[in-house]
């Protein structure tokens, strides 16, 4: 397996080669490092990774030595001869979004304010991946404090789309998506509050999973909107996402919002060996298509065509597909931005230049000191959202805005939950268009916010959703659709996506 083949391979392909002894973890890490270094020297770099960890090769050597030691001691022949018990991800690298803590590494959230901050511990999801043998490869670019839909609001500069470097890779986890799509990492962690995993996945032609709220621990993630935030995954195949979920999901004592799925949900645990739905199982499935999203203004004809192609495929599998109405979805984007900005204003109050953030002029009065630190440290989009959030929470307007938005959010969650009692899935496009040109929306906040039209309701309703690449536009830009399930039904979502992935035309 040569270096180019390594950087095009999925986790599962690399895992098979490692267990067969055909390649080493050190070869894998070096192959990705070479792609990263070559890209940084190019005239138009992707800007996907902001740091390639210097100790990644050392961890790779340790993984190779452990595998060799176990193989020698067990003398096991056959398929499991190169596997190591309890470490299904041994020697496999992954990239980490810059707002997820990796012990001893910078965690800047793409902000000048945290330029010198190093994480004192691993995020729980990172720790669980490490415990399974995986190797953190580097930090990925992001919109500052995860506030954006294009990865242009970053102190490191924009991230470009590997399919067309004049266009966005999406946001706020655009660096993670570009790293995987651009051959700089085989797998990446992102976070999403209103679509920041699924949108970049759609724009870059990847699978992107946003799990049920609470399935993955948020411990070690720098908070944006605490009732919305969730770690998600970027991968080139369904099996990689299933493999990651199998080792990272579950209750964490460090995060009170994390939980194990209630037994009454009948949720099947996601395992590495995930089978697609059979033909018989497909015949009893029902999928709902919300008219409010399909008929939304601004949907590009290429997106509509690829979505209809996916619906045609569903019907060919004997899945019952029906159009439905979800009236509350029309309020999803404004409700999301009211809730998210209010929570952001509260969460970001800690970055005052005293305990967190860069210190300013210590001779200034406290109020002036805070103002100076935040004005110089926060970018314009973060400042805008903090101002909106404080306005929403102010004594005179909290009843008009925040409390009303919370009530409407409950209505959205209720409508989605009731619908999913009658249907197994909701399906819709991930975005109204393919990746848009860099600079097109950065000076038009409302246009940027409307990028989240198809994604925010999922976060408000705390549902699992997967962006699935289904084709390309007439100009070759990737197009994605979403498969959305009931809470805790990640396994069902992934199984339907895997049947699509394994279909002859894919």
Curated annotation (Swiss-Prot):
Region (Disordered) residue spans: 153-177
Keyword Ligase on entry: yes
SUPFAM superfamilies associated with the record: Amidase signature (AS) enzymes
PROSITE patterns, alphabetized: AMIDASES
Entry's EC annotation: 6.3.5.7
Catalytic activity from the UniProt record: L-glutamyl-tRNA(Gln) + L-glutamine + ATP + H2O = L-glutaminyl-tRNA(Gln) + L-glutamate + ADP + phosphate + H(+)
GO cellular component terms attached to this protein's record: glutamyl-tRNA(Gln) amidotransferase complex
GO molecular function: ATP binding; glutaminyl-tRNA synthase (glutamine-hydrolyzing) activity
Family annotation (InterPro entries): Amidase (IPR000120), Amidase_CS (IPR020556), Amidase_dom (IPR023631), AS_sf (IPR036928), GatA (IPR004412)
Keyword annotations: ATP-binding, Ligase, Nucleotide-binding, Protein biosynthesis
Active-site positions on this chain: 97, 172, 196
Cystine pairs: none
GO BP term, pick one: translation
Keyword RNA-binding (UniProt): no
NCBIfam families in UniProt: gatA (TIGR00132)
Protein family per UniProt: Belongs to the amidase family. GatA subfamily.
Full protein name: Glutamyl-tRNA(Gln) amidotransferase subunit A
Lineage: Bacteria, Pseudomonadati, Spirochaetota, Spirochaetia, Spirochaetales
